[in-house]
């Protein structure tokens, strides 16, 4: 059964659409898309609306109405040419599609399948299951040892909150990159459910922090398959001796969970695996 957006939900989605498209226009120069820069000084950075319309093969009026979120311009047919014009990624194109659609997508609950339960029993890896708002809902002993999740309050189980706290203690470019990725994942989920109370509560609680606010206002959108790199673990670990270990981290989507995924982190070398094993054993003994 189709569930149409309420007027409030529609207005929230269109506001996100307008902001996102403006940010993407501002991020592109004419030379980036094969257009002449011209001799006139530009009052605003990036592409102008007529230039996007030209690249998309639609009228300037139609693109303007689309960017402004006007009902009569809300068509899935123009998303593809506009996405090409703005050089959108697949995740960004899907985000725009979610904001434009008239129906709300059903949001299934996050269920822990038996195979995932077995994975959570593996203490050679750090395994954390997060919901679509990046709040940890299940984790294994290795994750408890590394991230102190067993002792964390409800707020501190959220990855955006943990990023902000870690960055305030020790800012670095690598950590900022991870924060941008998490925020982009969160943005992607918010496009499906822009009025969600839990999501908006999380954002409101973090807006007072300048770093989060600056990254949030960039309006970047990311997908899990973009996280394919080795990073120093971005969060303050259980033991400071683990801070210098390098990790491989991958996020895998959980089917039919509307954005929930499992994060699997493993040390990149034997020394790291040995140290993680030691602190996990110590954590298990303390919890017994």
Where is each model-derived feature located?
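Hydrophobic protein-protein interaction segments
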Residues: 114-131, 138-286
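Short amphipathic recognition helices of helix-turn-helix/homeodomain-type DNA-binding modules
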Residues: 3-21, 74-119
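Core residues of bacterial helix-turn-helix
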Residues: 45, 55-56, 86, 140
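Short amphipathic alpha-helical surface patches that mediate protein-protein
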Residues: 68, 97-101, 135
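Recognition helix of helix-turn-helix/homeodomain-like DNA-binding domains
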Residues: 38-44, 49-50, 56-73
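Short polybasic/polar patches that bind polyanions
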Residues: 22, 26, 54, 84, ...
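A short, Lys/Arg-rich alpha-helix, primarily the initiator
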Residues: 1-48
């Amino acid at each position: 059964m189709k569930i149409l957006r309420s007027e409030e939900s529609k207005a929230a989605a269109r506001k996100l659409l307008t902001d996102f498209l403006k940010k993407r226009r501002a991020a592109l120069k004419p030379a980036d898309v094969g257009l002449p820069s011209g001799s006139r000084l530009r009052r605003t950075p990036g592409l102008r609306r007529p230039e996007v319309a030209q690249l998309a093969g639609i009228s300037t009026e139609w693109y303007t109405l689309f960017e402004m979120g006007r009902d009569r311009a809300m068509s899935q047919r123009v998303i593809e040419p506009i996405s090409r014009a703005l050089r959108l990624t697949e995740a960004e194109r899907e985000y725009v599609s979610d904001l434009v659609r008239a129906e709300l997508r059903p949001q299934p609950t996050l269920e822990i399948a038996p195979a995932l339960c077995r994975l959570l029993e593996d203490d050679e890896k750090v395994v954390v299951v997060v919901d679509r708002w990046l709040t940890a809902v299940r984790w294994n002993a290795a994750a408890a040892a590394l991230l102190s999740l067993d002792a964390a309050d409800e707020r501190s189980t959220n990855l955006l909150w943990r990023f902000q706290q870690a960055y305030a203690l020790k800012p670095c470019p690598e950590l900022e990159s991870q924060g941008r990725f998490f925020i982009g994942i969160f943005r992607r989920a918010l496009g499906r459910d822009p009025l969600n109370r839990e999501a908006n509560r999380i954002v409101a609680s973090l807006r007072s922090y300048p770093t989060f606010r600056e990254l949030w206002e960039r309006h970047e959108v990311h997908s899990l398959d973009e996280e394919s790199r080795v990073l120093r673990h971005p969060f303050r670990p259980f033991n400071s001796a683990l801070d210098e270990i390098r990790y491989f981290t991958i996020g895998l989507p959980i089917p039919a969970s509307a954005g929930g995924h499992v994060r699997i982190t493993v040390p990149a070398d034997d020394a790291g695996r040995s140290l993680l094993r030691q602190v996990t054993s110590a954590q298990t003994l303390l919890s017994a």
